[in-house]
Amino acid sequence: MKTFSAKPAEVTKKWVVIDATGLVVGRLATLVAMRLRGKHLPTYTPHVDCGDNIIIINAAKVVLTGRKRDNKVYYHHTGFIGGIKERTAKSILEGRFPERVVEKAVERMIPRGPLGRVQMGNLRVYPGAEHPHEAQQPETLDVGAMNRKNKRAA
């Protein structure tokens, strides 16, 4: 039997919406990264973008377990000498773009390269409940019901 290899023209992409209210960031990110890559499909091909288009709503209401909300630090560099900056997860979640916590968690689980950048383009994260993708008729995925550890009371 020959090994199956999906062609980009043969891939059919689904639209999935996930409500992140009360979900644990890492558990949500692993599931989203797997679906973005297409590893949940039997037709998965490593060099083809065969994953789903994923919409995450209420990303500002995610939960970090333990003391990570206060202790987890995100670093970035300005490009200037000595320009390393740091922010805690709490300051990002209470700041202007709280959806970046979820975006960074997923981004760091996707391979870095041209295909990874295309796959990250299939992810849309919104801090509130509204999203402009109703025309795509996304199906709802209840991540909290998949495993009792996926959801925490804030």
Curated annotation (Swiss-Prot):
Lineage top rank: taxon: Bacteria
| Biological processes, Gene Ontology terms | negative regulation of translation; translation
Q: List the residue ranges forming a coiled coil, or say none.
A: none
What Gene Ontology cellular-component terms does the record carry?
Answer: cytosolic large ribosomal subunit
- Disulfide-bond pairs as recorded: none
GO molecular function terms listed in the Swiss-Prot or TrEMBL record:
mRNA binding; structural constituent of ribosome
Q: Pfam family of this protein, just one?
A: Ribosomal_L13
Q: Which Gene3D superfamilies match?
A: Ribosomal protein L13 (3.90.1180.10)
Record-stated family: Belongs to the universal ribosomal protein uL13 family.
Function statement: This protein is one of the early assembly proteins of the 50S ribosomal subunit, although it is not seen to bind rRNA by itself. It is important during the early stages of 50S assembly.
What quaternary structure, including any partners, is listed in this protein's UniProt entry? Part of the 50S ribosomal subunit.
Per its record, how is this protein called by name?
Large ribosomal subunit protein uL13
